[in-house]
């Protein structure tokens, strides 16, 4: 807050008058001259949130527990953070100022009292009824979402986006009347710190007109709209307005630091054009292949939209704690940067013509892992933060009652033996495409190989981050082999320096060990862990990294076993059987979309093309109307499960589409 604003506020507080309020609260009524502010300070206990006068608007009771199905959410991004907007017109998830920050709208994992911003035709906010039609789409090759509402009285188009490249995050919602007239309703419930903090909300006047300003400690947001919503029940702001044919009404929500002056209104026409141009220019680099171009392009756009533009870090998903099993405890925070996901993204970007983005991700990877080679983590914060302590938000009931809601991720402390292999495989592909190593990048890769060498006998938690005891996971051992193999290739084929003989010896030793202990002749399959009879969908990665050919008899035997043990009744693939594999959690989850895409890729690469296409088309049908995918799919309820949108699923889709397109060639 500026010195002038602070001075005015202090003066107002000094001259305020207090009176008793309901529920034993003590209220202070004051005005701030010159700023057009008239507020009530409500003091309860130790916390002193300041709120605008709670005018009650008849008929505007707050609607609670309206969380939509996961697939009903659209996603928009400004490359700093992102928002989820339900088909019912409610923004139920937005974290500020970046992907892994606290939420301002947190109804997704709570109730409407934990923050949301509804904008929809009046009387239709509980559910989309038969009296109204709703259609939505992205403008081609962008993350600008259009929702067309047809009601009994008229038709409106709502355009929603987050401008790219400004100094701070802005959420734009434009309402255009197309036919007749439509009464629109908005309900703004601002709740900072994952729904725990009710901000100080007041009206201000500036050169751009009237606005609502909300402040909570270091954060502030401001709504510019005409008309502004009025103070409603439970410290919400609600209102209705009518849009006639040919009329356009704009709403813009700005996020900024509370110690800064409120930002001016933006030119929405210009912002819309600039944002559309950005996304279309970016996606124009995509090298089209034929089949599944629309799905691959959207998947690449999702990967870009989950990327923090300044740091280059890509988050695994926009959300935390969307359940893998509804009502269960498998709820994790995915708003961080996994080395595995970043490495796979680097591969996908390079394969499809996004060379600059691939280099950006390489640089993020190298910065994140710089330092002690004995201390490489599996995941980092958006800027490379190492400490991501996990805690439970007990005040949030969770998505459809799926508790606990977690922030942070305790897996950052886990040892997962596969991660260095993922990174080394991706960086080797960059080398093979002509990207030269510098002294810094190759030194760090040598350090990574030293990390593998130092941990070569160590058991791990595996790719699925199991919270049970550490074991010898076959996939992890294969990825350690892949790391050493790419080191050997770098010396032999690219002339880089390194202890060739030692790396080759370690590589060959790992291969012999895996073939002896990771393959069961009894079931004719590789196994999840050494000495077990359980299988795991991660075994489909073995041919992807060149450990064996896709059509090797041992791989084909493994595929047969996976089909027998892990395919569900709808033909989608589970990661593993949670009932029999001890992962430290209660059993129960749904088919994993990335693994199912891996199976489609395996089919395509071994001549089972018709089966690959059937599975691919089945999987495409698990996405929503906007082309977005979650982590898992509940085939019984025909609905998405897990965090969303999920980078890993989109990455696997790209690989499967590439394999099928190679079959056409």
Locate the predicted segments by residue.
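Intrinsically disordered, low-complexity segments enriched in serine/threonine/proline/glycine
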Residues: 8, 26-29, 38-41, 49-50, ...
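Low-acidity, Ser/Thr- and Arg-rich intrinsically disordered low-complexity segments
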Residues: 1-18, 22, 26-27, 31
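Residue-level detector of transmembrane insertion/anchoring sites
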Residues: 4-5, 13, 37-38, 42, ...
């Amino acid at each position: 807050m500026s010195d002038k604003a602070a001075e005015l506020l202090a003066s107002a507080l000094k001259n305020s008058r207090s009176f008793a309020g309901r529920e034993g609260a003590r209220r202070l009524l004051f005005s701030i001259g010159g700023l057009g502010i008239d507020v009530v300070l409500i003091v309860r206990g130790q916390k002193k949130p300041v709120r605008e006068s709670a005018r009650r608007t008849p008929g505007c009771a707050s609607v609670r527990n309206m969380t939509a199905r996961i697939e009903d959410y659209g996603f928009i991004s400004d490359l700093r953070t992102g928002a989820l907007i339900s088909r019912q017109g409610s923004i139920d998830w937005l974290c500020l100022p970046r992907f892994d920050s606290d939420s301002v709208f947190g109804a997704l994992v709570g109730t409407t009292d934990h923050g949301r911003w509804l904008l929809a035709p009046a009387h239709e906010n509980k559910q989309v009824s038969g009296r109204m039609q709703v259609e939505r789409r992205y403008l081609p090759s962008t993350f600008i979402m259009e929702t067309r509402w047809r009601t009994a009285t008229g038709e409106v188009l709502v355009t929603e986006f987050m401008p790219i490249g400004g100094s701070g995050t802005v959420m734009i919602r434009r309402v255009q009347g197309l036919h007749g007239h439509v009464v629109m309703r908005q309900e703004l419930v601002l709740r900072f710190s994952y729904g725990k903090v009710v901000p100080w909300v007041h009206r201000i006047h500036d050169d751009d007109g009237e606005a609502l300003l909300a402040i909570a400690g270091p954060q502030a947001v401001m709504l510019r709209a005409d008309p502004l919503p009025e103070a409603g029940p439970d410290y919400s702001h609600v209102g209705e307005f009518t849009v006639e044919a040919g009329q356009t009404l704009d709403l813009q929500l700005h996020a900024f630091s509370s110690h800064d002056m409120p930002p001016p209104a933006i030119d929405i026409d210009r912002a819309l054009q600039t944002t559309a141009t950005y996304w279309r220019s970016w996606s124009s680099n995509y090298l089209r292949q034929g089949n599944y171009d629309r799905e691959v392009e959207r998947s690449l756009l999702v990967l870009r939209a989950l990327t923090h533009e300044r740091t280059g870090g890509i988050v695994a998903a926009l959300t935390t704690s969307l359940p893998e099993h509804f009502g269960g405890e498998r709820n994790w925070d995915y708003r961080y940067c996994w080395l595995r996901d970043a490495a796979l993204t680097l591969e996908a970007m390079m394969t499809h013509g996004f060379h600059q983005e691939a280099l950006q991700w390489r640089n993020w990877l190298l910065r994140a892992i710089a330092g002690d080679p004995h201390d490489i983590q599996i995941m980092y914060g958006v800027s490379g933060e190492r400490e991501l302590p996990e805690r439970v938000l007990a005040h949030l009931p969770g998505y459809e009652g799926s508790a606990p809601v977690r922030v942070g991720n305790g897996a950052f402390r886990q040892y997962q033996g596969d991660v260095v292999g993922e990174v080394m495989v991706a960086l080797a592909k960059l080398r093979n495409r002509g990207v030269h190593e510098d002294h810094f990048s190759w030194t760090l890769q040598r350090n990574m190989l030293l990390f593998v060498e130092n941990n070569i006998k160590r058991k791990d938690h595996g790719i699925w981050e199991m919270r049970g005891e550490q074991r010898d996971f076959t996939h992890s051992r294969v990825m350690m082999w892949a790391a050493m193999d790419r080191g050997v290739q770098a010396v032999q084929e690219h002339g880089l320096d390194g202890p060739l003989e030692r790396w080759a010896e370690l590589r060959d030793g790992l291969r012999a060990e895996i073939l002896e202990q990771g393959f069961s002749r009894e079931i004719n399959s590789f196994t999840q862990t050494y000495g077990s009879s359980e299988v795991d969908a991660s075994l489909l990665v073995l041919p992807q990294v060149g450990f064996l050919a896709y059509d090797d008899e041992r791989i084909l035997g493994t595929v047969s076993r996976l089909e027998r043990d892990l395919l569900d009744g709808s033909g989608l693939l589970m990661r593993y059987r949670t009932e029999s594999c001890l992962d430290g959690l209660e059993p129960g989850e749904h088919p994993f979309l990335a693994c199912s895409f891996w199976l489609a890729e395996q089919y395509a690469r071994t001549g089972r093309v018709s089966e690959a296409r059937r599975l691919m088309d089945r999987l495409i049908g698990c996405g929503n109307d906007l082309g977005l995918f979650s982590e898992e799919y509940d085939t019984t309820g025909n609905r998405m499960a897990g965090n969303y949108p999920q980078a890993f699923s989109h990455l696997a889709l790209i690989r499967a589409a590439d394999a099928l397109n190679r079959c056409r060639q």
